[in-house]
Amino acid sequence: MQKISTIEEFEQVVRDNSRFIFLKHSTTCPISGAGYDAFSAFASSQKEVPAYYLHVQEARPLSNYIAETYNVKHESPQALFFEEGKVKWHASHWKISEDELAKQIAK
C-alpha cells in the first residue's frame, strides 16, 4: 500500500495501472480508522491490484481533484476502484470491508 500526496503522483498511478484501489483516509475520524484497517488488510492479502491511499488532511488538493475529475462526491473514508482510468466502484464509511473490496475486484 503506497501513500500518494500530489495530483502528479496520482496521475502517474492512473497512467501506470489499468486497475487499482484507492482510499481517502481522515486521520482524525474513528470510522475512517476502521475503513483504513479494512482497506489495508485487503490490500496486504492480495496482489491482483495495487493499493494506494491519501491522508485527507495532508492532501486536500488531491482529494478535491479526484472528486471533481471523476465526479464522485468526496467522503472520508472513501474507497474507490479504478479500472481503465474510470471509477468503477466506490463506497464510504461502514460499507468499506475486505469482503466488499474482494467482490468488486472480482467482477
Give names to the regions the model predicted:
Residues 9, 35-42, 54, 68, ...:
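A structural signal for the main folded, soluble domain(s) of proteins
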Residues 70-83:
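Structural micro-motif
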Residues 48-63:
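Thiol-based oxidoreductase modules, predominantly thioredoxin-like and allied folds used
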Residues 1-11:
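N-terminal "domain-start" segment that seeds a small globular fold
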Residues 12-45:
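Local sequence-structure signature of Cys/Sec-based thiol-disulfide redox active-site neighborhoods
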Residues 44-49, 100-102:
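Short cysteine/histidine-rich metal-coordination sites, predominantly Zn2+-binding motifs
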Residues 81-107:
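Non-catalytic, surface beta->alpha helical segment in thiol-disulfide oxidoreductase systems
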